[in-house]
Swiss-Prot record:
Constituent of viral factories. Binds to ssRNA and dsRNA. Residues 109-132 have a biased composition (Basic and acidic residues). Residues 87-206 are annotated as: Disordered. Disulfide bonds: none annotated. Signal peptide: none annotated. It holds the Pfam family Pns11_12. InterPro entries: Pns11/12. GO terms for molecular function: RNA binding. One of its GO terms (cellular component) is host cell cytoplasm. Keywords: Host cytoplasm, RNA-binding. Belongs to the phytoreovirus RNA-binding protein family. This is RNA-binding protein. Its main location: host cell.
Amino acid sequence: MTSNEENPVGVQTLKPNNDAKRVFEMRKIPSSNVMRVEYTKQSKYRTCVCPSALHFAEECPSNDVLFSVGAHRNMLCVAKAFDQTKPRGMQRGNRRNNVAKVMTLNELMPKDDSNDRKKAKTSKDRKVEKSSRGRASSSRSRGRGGFSRNGRDRRETDSQDEYSEDNSYKSEEESTEDETAPLTKKDMLKMMSMFQSGAKSKRRPR
Protein backbone atom coordinates (compact mmCIF):
# COMPACT_ATOMS: atom_id res chain seq x y z
CA MET A 1 0.00 0.00 0.00
CA THR A 2 1.23 3.46 -0.86
CA SER A 3 0.37 6.76 0.75
CA ASN A 4 -3.18 8.12 0.83
CA GLU A 5 -2.29 11.02 -1.45
CA GLU A 6 -1.60 8.78 -4.43
CA ASN A 7 -4.72 6.65 -3.96
CA PRO A 8 -8.12 8.37 -4.03
CA VAL A 9 -10.66 7.83 -1.31
CA GLY A 10 -12.39 4.47 -1.42
CA VAL A 11 -9.80 2.79 -3.68
CA GLN A 12 -7.72 -0.14 -2.50
CA THR A 13 -4.70 -1.17 -4.58
CA LEU A 14 -3.48 -4.75 -4.12
CA LYS A 15 -0.27 -6.25 -5.46
CA PRO A 16 0.04 -10.05 -5.17
CA ASN A 17 3.36 -11.44 -4.04
CA ASN A 18 3.80 -13.66 -7.09
CA ASP A 19 3.64 -11.01 -9.79
CA ALA A 20 4.18 -7.33 -9.10
CA LYS A 21 2.96 -6.28 -12.54
CA ARG A 22 -0.64 -7.12 -11.73
CA VAL A 23 -2.36 -4.19 -10.05
CA PHE A 24 -5.92 -4.30 -8.80
CA GLU A 25 -8.15 -1.44 -7.79
CA MET A 26 -11.37 -2.17 -5.99
CA ARG A 27 -14.02 0.53 -5.65
CA LYS A 28 -17.39 0.56 -3.97
CA ILE A 29 -19.99 1.90 -6.40
CA PRO A 30 -22.32 4.27 -4.51
CA SER A 31 -25.89 3.18 -3.74
CA SER A 32 -25.25 -0.46 -4.63
CA ASN A 33 -23.63 -3.63 -3.34
CA VAL A 34 -21.46 -4.01 -6.44
CA MET A 35 -17.69 -3.95 -6.15
CA ARG A 36 -15.89 -2.76 -9.24
CA VAL A 37 -12.47 -4.32 -9.80
CA GLU A 38 -10.15 -2.70 -12.31
CA TYR A 39 -7.39 -4.97 -13.58
CA THR A 40 -4.46 -3.49 -15.50
CA LYS A 41 -1.66 -5.59 -17.00
CA GLN A 42 0.49 -4.64 -19.98
CA SER A 43 -1.87 -1.84 -21.04
CA LYS A 44 -4.87 -4.20 -20.93
CA TYR A 45 -7.91 -2.94 -19.06
CA ARG A 46 -10.68 -5.17 -17.76
CA THR A 47 -13.55 -4.51 -15.36
CA CYS A 48 -14.89 -7.32 -13.20
CA VAL A 49 -18.20 -6.83 -11.42
CA CYS A 50 -19.08 -9.22 -8.60
CA PRO A 51 -22.70 -8.79 -7.41
CA SER A 52 -22.16 -10.72 -4.17
CA ALA A 53 -18.95 -8.93 -3.18
CA LEU A 54 -19.44 -8.17 0.50
CA HIS A 55 -15.83 -8.37 1.69
CA PHE A 56 -12.56 -6.78 0.69
CA ALA A 57 -10.42 -8.46 -1.92
CA GLU A 58 -8.05 -11.10 -0.66
CA GLU A 59 -5.26 -12.96 -2.36
CA CYS A 60 -6.40 -16.44 -3.25
CA PRO A 61 -4.04 -19.30 -2.27
CA SER A 62 -4.52 -20.93 -5.66
CA ASN A 63 -1.97 -20.14 -8.37
CA ASP A 64 -4.58 -19.93 -11.12
CA VAL A 65 -6.70 -17.39 -9.28
CA LEU A 66 -5.32 -13.91 -8.66
CA PHE A 67 -7.63 -12.93 -5.82
CA SER A 68 -11.02 -13.88 -4.48
CA VAL A 69 -13.89 -11.79 -3.15
CA GLY A 70 -15.17 -13.01 0.18
CA ALA A 71 -14.51 -16.27 1.96
CA HIS A 72 -17.96 -17.81 1.72
CA ARG A 73 -19.48 -20.64 -0.30
CA ASN A 74 -20.46 -18.59 -3.36
CA MET A 75 -16.95 -17.28 -3.93
CA LEU A 76 -16.33 -15.21 -7.06
CA CYS A 77 -12.75 -15.25 -8.26
CA VAL A 78 -10.90 -13.27 -10.90
CA ALA A 79 -8.55 -15.62 -12.71
CA LYS A 80 -6.02 -15.48 -15.51
CA ALA A 81 -8.78 -15.59 -18.10
CA PHE A 82 -8.61 -11.81 -18.30
CA ASP A 83 -5.33 -12.18 -20.20
CA GLN A 84 -7.24 -13.99 -22.99
CA THR A 85 -4.19 -16.24 -23.35
CA LYS A 86 -5.53 -18.88 -20.94
CA PRO A 87 -9.31 -18.81 -21.22
CA ARG A 88 -9.66 -22.02 -19.20
CA GLY A 89 -8.06 -20.45 -16.15
CA MET A 90 -11.39 -18.90 -15.14
CA GLN A 91 -13.13 -22.27 -15.14
CA ARG A 92 -10.44 -24.04 -13.15
CA GLY A 93 -11.37 -24.37 -9.51
CA ASN A 94 -14.75 -22.67 -9.98
CA ARG A 95 -18.23 -23.89 -10.68
CA ARG A 96 -20.17 -22.81 -13.72
CA ASN A 97 -22.47 -20.45 -11.86
CA ASN A 98 -19.74 -18.83 -9.77
CA VAL A 99 -17.63 -17.49 -12.65
CA ALA A 100 -17.15 -13.74 -12.54
CA LYS A 101 -18.58 -11.75 -15.44
CA VAL A 102 -16.99 -8.91 -17.39
CA MET A 103 -19.50 -6.08 -17.58
CA THR A 104 -19.54 -2.46 -18.67
CA LEU A 105 -20.80 0.52 -16.72
CA ASN A 106 -23.85 0.80 -19.00
CA GLU A 107 -24.92 -2.68 -17.96
CA LEU A 108 -24.44 -1.72 -14.33
CA MET A 109 -26.83 1.22 -14.43
CA PRO A 110 -30.35 0.26 -13.28
CA LYS A 111 -32.94 0.32 -16.04
CA ASP A 112 -36.08 2.42 -15.65
CA ASP A 113 -38.60 -0.34 -16.30
CA SER A 114 -40.89 0.56 -13.41
CA ASN A 115 -43.69 1.61 -15.78
CA ASP A 116 -43.41 -1.65 -17.75
CA ARG A 117 -43.57 -3.64 -14.54
CA LYS A 118 -46.68 -1.77 -13.42
CA LYS A 119 -48.38 -2.43 -16.76
CA ALA A 120 -47.51 -6.11 -16.61
CA LYS A 121 -48.77 -6.43 -13.07
CA THR A 122 -52.08 -4.74 -13.88
CA SER A 123 -52.66 -6.93 -16.93
CA LYS A 124 -51.90 -10.10 -14.95
CA ASP A 125 -54.19 -9.00 -12.13
CA ARG A 126 -56.98 -8.35 -14.60
CA LYS A 127 -56.58 -11.79 -16.15
CA VAL A 128 -56.64 -13.44 -12.73
CA GLU A 129 -59.73 -11.49 -11.72
CA LYS A 130 -61.54 -12.43 -14.93
CA SER A 131 -60.69 -16.11 -14.55
CA SER A 132 -61.76 -16.16 -10.90
CA ARG A 133 -65.04 -14.44 -11.73
CA GLY A 134 -65.77 -16.90 -14.52
CA ARG A 135 -65.06 -19.90 -12.33
CA ALA A 136 -67.23 -18.60 -9.49
CA SER A 137 -70.18 -17.82 -11.76
CA SER A 138 -69.96 -21.18 -13.53
CA SER A 139 -69.85 -23.11 -10.25
CA ARG A 140 -72.91 -21.25 -8.97
CA SER A 141 -74.91 -21.74 -12.17
CA ARG A 142 -74.27 -25.48 -12.25
CA GLY A 143 -76.77 -26.10 -9.47
CA ARG A 144 -76.64 -28.00 -6.21
CA GLY A 145 -74.93 -31.18 -7.40
CA GLY A 146 -71.91 -32.64 -5.62
CA PHE A 147 -70.76 -32.12 -2.05
CA SER A 148 -71.42 -29.10 0.12
CA ARG A 149 -69.05 -27.19 2.40
CA ASN A 150 -69.73 -29.29 5.49
CA GLY A 151 -68.98 -32.54 3.63
CA ARG A 152 -72.56 -33.84 3.34
CA ASP A 153 -74.00 -34.99 0.06
CA ARG A 154 -76.17 -32.35 -1.56
CA ARG A 155 -78.23 -34.98 -3.31
CA GLU A 156 -79.77 -35.86 0.05
CA THR A 157 -81.20 -32.36 0.36
CA ASP A 158 -82.55 -32.45 -3.21
CA SER A 159 -85.34 -34.80 -2.12
CA GLN A 160 -86.44 -32.25 0.45
CA ASP A 161 -86.14 -29.34 -1.99
CA GLU A 162 -88.45 -31.06 -4.49
CA TYR A 163 -91.40 -30.87 -2.06
CA SER A 164 -90.65 -27.28 -1.03
CA GLU A 165 -91.85 -24.29 -2.97
CA ASP A 166 -89.70 -22.21 -5.30
CA ASN A 167 -89.79 -19.18 -3.01
CA SER A 168 -88.47 -21.10 -0.04
CA TYR A 169 -85.78 -22.67 -2.24
CA LYS A 170 -84.59 -19.24 -3.39
CA SER A 171 -84.64 -17.85 0.11
CA GLU A 172 -82.43 -20.73 1.32
CA GLU A 173 -79.88 -20.06 -1.41
CA GLU A 174 -79.81 -16.35 -0.68
CA SER A 175 -79.40 -16.97 3.04
CA THR A 176 -76.51 -19.38 2.44
CA GLU A 177 -74.76 -16.89 0.18
CA ASP A 178 -75.19 -14.05 2.64
CA GLU A 179 -74.45 -15.98 5.80
CA THR A 180 -71.45 -18.22 5.36
CA ALA A 181 -71.73 -19.70 8.89
CA PRO A 182 -72.01 -23.53 8.91
CA LEU A 183 -75.06 -25.37 10.25
CA THR A 184 -75.33 -25.93 13.98
CA LYS A 185 -75.49 -29.34 15.65
CA LYS A 186 -79.21 -28.97 16.35
CA ASP A 187 -79.99 -28.36 12.69
CA MET A 188 -77.89 -31.33 11.68
CA LEU A 189 -79.64 -33.61 14.18
CA LYS A 190 -83.08 -32.46 13.03
CA MET A 191 -82.26 -33.09 9.39
CA MET A 192 -80.78 -36.51 10.13
CA SER A 193 -83.84 -37.52 12.16
CA MET A 194 -86.15 -36.38 9.36
CA PHE A 195 -84.25 -38.39 6.74
CA GLN A 196 -84.12 -41.48 8.94
CA SER A 197 -87.84 -41.32 9.76
CA GLY A 198 -88.72 -40.87 6.09
CA ALA A 199 -86.56 -43.81 5.02
CA LYS A 200 -88.00 -46.07 7.72
CA SER A 201 -91.59 -45.17 6.86
CA LYS A 202 -90.98 -46.01 3.20
CA ARG A 203 -89.31 -49.34 3.94
CA ARG A 204 -91.92 -50.63 6.41
CA PRO A 205 -94.46 -52.89 4.71
CA ARG A 206 -98.07 -52.09 5.52
